[in-house]
Amino acid sequence: MEQKIFGQINQEESGSKKNIYLMQPTYMNSSSVHFPYAIGALASYAWQFDDIRENYALKKCFFLRNKTEEVLNSLENPFLIGFSCYMWNFEYNKLLAKKIKGRYPNCIIVFGGQHIAPGEENLIKYPFVDILMHNEGEVFFRDLLRALANGTQLKEVNNISFRENGQTVATPVTTAKDFNFPSPYESGFYDKLIEDNPNIEFIPLVETNRGCPNHCAYCSWGKMNAKVRLFPMDRVFRDLEWVSEHKMEFLGFADANFGMFPRDEQIIDKIIELYEKNGYPVKFQVSYSKNSEDRVFRITEKLNKKGMDKGVTLSFQSMSPTVQKNIGRSNMYIEHFKTLLDKYSQAGIPTYTDLILGLPGETLESFTDGIETLLEYGQHTSLFVHLCEWLPCAEMGKKEYMEYFGINYSKVPLNQPHMSRIENEEVGEFSRIITLTNSMSHDDWKKMNIFSACVLCFHHLGMLQIAALYIYHQKGIKYKDFYSSLAEYLLSSDGAASNALKKIKKRLDDIIEKNSAVVFFDDRFGNVAWPFEEYLFLDIITQKDLFFKQIKNFLSNYIDDDALLCELLAYQSFIIKQINVSHKSFSGSYNWKDYFGALLKDQKDAVLKKEKVHYVIDDNRAAVTWQEYARNVLWYGRRGGKNIYTSEIKEVIGDERE
């Protein structure tokens, strides 16, 4: 598109045009926030048409959770206000919409987005909402504006629900035939946002395709957009050029299965070309396809060589065949997972695996066994365990599905790790965390959370990974037994690690009984929401020496050679990153580096040899404050296992020693 749509609009007088406002409020993550992509896409499509521009003025778009009175006072005779609704803004949107309706009763309030389920339920619940928009909205939002301008009956507009003569009406939900949507980047939609907010680090989200062929019960993606449609390559390339030219450091793709199509390799080549030319974008993140392994490997290999990718997902969601059947998902065979894990490891590409806690059919035993399987097959780099959330547009959100599997949830403050807390917030948002099913009691759910927090903190974040590997390979103790015993020990004793884990246990009780939050805030680590395992790690790392002194008593149950145990713990402490430490050294009597390096590559014949060693680490990027450490080392570095040293460990031979 040669001419910016919004560059033209902003120069026009609104005159007798009807005023339109669009809302997609979200939380800040520290100083960064995503561009409001949904409303940008809707506006860019609608305002390319002459009749829309002749009848309507797009007055302003809101993307932050401003005080509702400030928003209300900024409105000028609003004709229609569209709200893009998600779990992180639904309560705010309702509060603001109700206030707007009170002051401007003739203003048309439209709710759409991922949180608006099919049907008329939200119209019945919320009388201040006039129209619901379902599924994707570009074409149908334009059609709605046309119908309102021309006096056409709303029944002629697809994908909406509304009231008529005291009754609710729902029109057919379809997918638009026209997919030639203009880009909100190229249209100029974001230009004024950048100009008006120079201190905000905007994060761009680009679509190369839309849709998902999978039909996972916990997700609304495939249910709402099953057919995958491709945006033209010239549009994709121009979006990437815009991101690079505007010096955007981080780039995310909205694709559900990137790597599915052969052209995706060309897209990656373009990103790398722009990075080499302009230095931007620096980091790239996307959800990869699980069915295009060779292509995804080539893509991630290219990105990894440039240091642009945080790793590739090798996900299961659950290791239980029963659960997989219940959620409509098929996983790769575990032996094939092992092959892929080895392939990526040999190429030096980080991998991470996702599990979801609380899926229907999961039991305490199947959950802990599943994590044991992943560890035994070599996933030591990065594991994420997400709490299962009830979503209104997902299959799991249906009443019949919930009743069949005995699903119940706890309505808790918003589960959005790493968001910033807003002081004196007018209204909070909520997540609906599944804490009860036919196969999982509340007590089971709490035990699963304690177990996963321990595995993720002490193993995948590295706090006791070395010890667990040694005990598994030398003593034959299963990982799940080790970490279950560790949790019991910490909860029954006092000390550096015990306090934080006890706090998590208390919080889990409060989630069930009082609907408390599933994240922690701690001023030591900035205004950031931390999931359980990250909070546990951060609390312990601030008192690392006390922790290792305490934990020695527990480990002595498995390792009776006191000298070896002391040296193993010293090496474990040595490889964990700290603040204000740019140089450190270690001397020992065993080939720790080679031994554990081999075990992490799943070389089961690795031998721990008694030999004098001296290791050094130099890190000129060491964090100097706990807030910097929490953000850069743990939050940003977690997917690549960057909170522990690996390749940075250098062995010093003979006269080279300090």
PLM regions: where:
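N-terminal [4Fe-4S]-dependent radical SAM core
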Residues: 2-21, 28, 163-205
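Conserved C-terminal portion of the radical SAM core fold
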Residues: 80, 108, 237, 242-254, ...
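Glycine- and acidic-residue-enriched helix-capping/strand-helix junction motifs
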Residues: 28-42
